[in-house]
A protein has these predicted regions:
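Conserved alpha-helix/loop element of class I SAM-dependent methyltransferases that forms part
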Residues: 21-40
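A conserved beta-strand element that flanks and buttresses the S-adenosyl-L-methionine
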Residues: 106
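N-terminal, positively charged/glycine-rich alpha-helical extensions of SAM-dependent methyltransferases
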Residues: 1-13
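Class I SAM-dependent methyltransferase SAM/SAH-binding core
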Residues: 43, 47-94
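Short catalytic micro-motifs in class I SAM-dependent methyltransferases
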Residues: 109-110
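Conserved class I S-adenosyl-L-methionine
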Residues: 133-162
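A short glycine-rich, Lys/Arg-flanked "PGG" loop and its adjoining helix->strand segment in the class I
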Residues: 118-130
Length: 208
């Protein structure tokens, strides 16, 4: 995890520039997320520079936006103008929040780059309310085009911490197996480099 965090610390200042090429993808994600988080208490894990949190905070009750990288959080705080949005450095495997604290948990483009995604899901389940919603879009690198595979190769050479190369169905199966719940609001958002980008709202049942 230290190497993982160091990669993002080194690249925090470049992150927003890097993400601009996927602006259309993210605009679609904001559009899909806003109705789900309206008037809700939200936790975002792996917020990076806070792109998603800043674009949806207006409709929420409040957002706790967290990341393991201090440099990413420093970048996020620079552009924060909302009293409803709080940024902090946290470990997604060991969160300081009480159980059943949040209506919605967002973990975007992160489960494929952490070494133990199942451990993160256990912690998410702990802090999510019984009728809460998990929103977990991620890149499905097994479906990359040739261009996407070449790009991913050079990103790995630069230290990008890719751990899981799921297909869309493998990712869905991973979530179902670990969470044992039904999914609602499942959408697939095409991604420019040829990787699937899947938005999942997972309703957690009372018996889960």
């Amino acid at each position: 995890m230290r190497e993982h965090k160091n990669f993002w610390d080194r690249n925090a200042g470049l992150y927003d520039c890097f993400m601009r090429k996927d602006r259309a993808v993210y605009e679609k994600i904001y559009e899909l997320i806003r109705p789900i988080v309206k008037d809700k208490t939200v936790l975002e894990l792996a917020t990076g520079t806070g792109l998603i949190a800043k674009h949806i905070v207006k409709v929420t009750a409040r957002i706790e936006a967290t990341d393991a990288s201090p440099e990413m959080i420093a970048e996020a705080k620079r552009g924060n103008c909302s009293a409803k949005l709080h940024f902090s450095v946290q470990d997604m495997f060991s969160l300081p929040y009480a159980g059943n604290s949040f209506d919605v948990v967002i973990v975007s483009n992160a489960l494929h780059i952490v070494p133990q995604p199942e451990k993160s899901l256990r912690e998410i389940k702990r802090v999510l309310k019984d009728d809460g919603v998990l929103i977990a879009p991620t890149f499905t690198h097994a479906e990359n085009s040739l261009r996407g595979r070449i790009k991913a190769y050079f990103m790995r050479l630069a230290g990008f911490p890719l751990h899981s190369r799921w297909t869309s169905e493998e990712y869905l199966s991973f979530l179902r197996l670990r969470r044992g719940e039904h999914q609602n609001a499942i959408k697939t958002v095409p991604q420019r480099q040829g990787a699937g980008h899947r938005l999942l709202g997972c309703q957690r049942g009372k018996s889960a």
